[in-house]
Amino acid sequence: MRLTVWTYEGPPQVGAMRVATAMRGVHYVVHAPQGDSYADLLFTMIERRPGRPAVSYTSFQARDLGTDTAALFKTAAADAVARFQPEALLVGSSCTGELIQDDPGGLAKALGLSIPVIPLELPSYQRKENWGAAETFYRLVRTMAGPAAPAPGTPRAPRPAGQRPRCNLLGPTALGFRHRDDVQAVVALLGRMGVDVAVVAPLGASPADLARLGEADFNVVLYPEIADTAVRWLERAFGQPSVRTVPIGVGATRAFIAEVAAVAGVDPAPALAEESLRLPWWSRSVDSTYLTGKRVFIFGDATHAVAAARVATEEFGFEVVGLGTYAREYARELRACAGALGLEALITDDYLDVEAAIADAHPDLVLGTQMERHIAKRLGVPCAVISAPVHVQDFPARTAPQMGFDGANVLFDTWVHPLMMGLEEHLLMMFRDDFEFHGDAAPSHLSAHRPTGEAVGDAVGEPPAAPRDQAAPAATLDGSAAQSDPARTTPPGAPSWEDSAEKELRKVPFFVRGKARRNTERFAAERGLASISVETLYDAKAHFGR
């Protein structure tokens, strides 16, 4: 473990909390010290859930370590069952509680409770959040659905004639990126195909619902990071086929419809005929051409990163210049996707490595997590969030799915708008020194109310006073500012910039300004120039343009 200001995934017990909180009738008792009790903060402040998470803590203190901490856990478990009346109880330790080795599973079973007790062995120092969520969901599914599983080798009974096919939607959890909205979009899409949804799990499911998973005709894997382990067990135990195409983007949604139709034996035409797409007409318009070929850097969980890479290249006409994930369990899939794009995949959970890769790639747009939003803001690059972990603004009150045809429309808005607003911002930056548009100029439509004490020279074109934003460059979005562009600091012995060249550099769009600065400094250094003038800037542009 290491000390850091940011982590893409929490310890595995956070994944268990996400599953327990997403479900009904499940409670999770965690053997943990006082400092590990952060579930309320995660689920009520960030996700803005209306109720408290289904998590209880032993909350032992330092003075308790010399006493019987096992008794504390048994008391906490018994109290949680008496108070919350769950249908199933999850028990486990936090990363700190794991060190005292009290065996929560054995202690809970010794209580002789009348409900299923599911012990979670989550190695906090080897695994992380998504693995913990997948393992918790698998343990729940196997415990609740296992008794109904047929004997090995038993053929699956055919669906009764006249009965609509039924499926399970597996993978959505609490604190997931747009999981609630994705479920709504996919349920509606399946309904248009004549397919009923038997169970959605873990989100909104109860232990009794998990016991019915084997009754469905097939399973739909919405989020492999969470559902894959459980789905593989359901395939073996019940002989259920699985639909694994994740319907993010237009092409993937059509492929998803085709796969569901093949598995369920239904006609895909109704779902394809009711496409609610607004993307194709815009893609054929003249306005779309100036976004073609934009350079995009993508980082997130494997499911969303791979889907974003496909959508960016095949549907938006973008050029993917970087692709990575923090989910090492899916490194193989991401490397295959990156290799098809001629890239080397970035597999890391260190945000500093991601920041360095983004700075080196000089993208026009960053698609990532909450941390990439911060990185892009610091580098002066437009950004859109496509993956967890996210903050409160990515749990909107409105419906904003990522999956299905409606999700494709949301992707279009989310990805294109930052680029278009970036162009507008560039125009504002270009003209900010103009006598009519500088920071201290009064709005032109309020000229009748202009203060009388201003110098008449302003109206005849005398140079205005330095705008306030130039006095504090670190607070601007100008890529030439020291804290907005990591290349701004000139190393010792490097050519210095003349004021006129700095002013001309600010006319370069902010999303390529850092690259223009570095290329110009390299051009000047190779020719032994002590200073960089406007002529040097344009000579460097011509040189690298060739």
Swiss-Prot record:
Single annotated GO MF: oxidoreductase activity, acting on iron-sulfur proteins as donors
InterPro entries: ChlB/BchB/BchZ, LI-POR_suB-like_C, Nase/OxRdtase_comp1, P-CP_red_C, Protochl_reductB, Protochlorophyllide_Rdtase
Keyword Iron-sulfur annotated: yes
Catalytic activity: chlorophyllide a + oxidized 2[4Fe-4S]-[ferredoxin] + 2 ADP + 2 phosphate = protochlorophyllide a + reduced 2[4Fe-4S]-[ferredoxin] + 2 ATP + 2 H2O
Pathways per UniProt: Porphyrin-containing compound metabolism; bacteriochlorophyll biosynthesis (light-independent)
Chain sites annotated for binding [4Fe-4S] cluster: D36
EC number in record: 1.3.7.7
GO biological process: light-independent bacteriochlorophyll biosynthetic process; photosynthesis, dark reaction
Cofactor section: [4Fe-4S] cluster
Segments of this protein annotated with the region Disordered: 443-501
Binding residues annotated for substrate, in chain numbering: G422, L423
Active site per database record: D287 (proton donor)
Domain of life: Bacteria
Cofactor binding notes: Binds 1 [4Fe-4S] cluster per heterodimer. The cluster is bound at the heterodimer interface by residues from both subunits.
Subunit structure: Protochlorophyllide reductase is composed of three subunits; BchL, BchN and BchB. Forms a heterotetramer of two BchB and two BchN subunits.
Entry similarity comment: Belongs to the ChlB/BchB/BchZ family.
Function: Component of the dark-operative protochlorophyllide reductase (DPOR) that uses Mg-ATP and reduced ferredoxin to reduce ring D of protochlorophyllide (Pchlide) to form chlorophyllide a (Chlide). This reaction is light-independent. The NB-protein (BchN-BchB) is the catalytic component of the complex.
Descriptive protein name: Light-independent protochlorophyllide reductase subunit B
Species of origin: Rhodospirillum rubrum (strain ATCC 11170 / ATH 1.1.1 / DSM 467 / LMG 4362 / NCIMB 8255 / S1)
Gene from which the chain derives: bchB
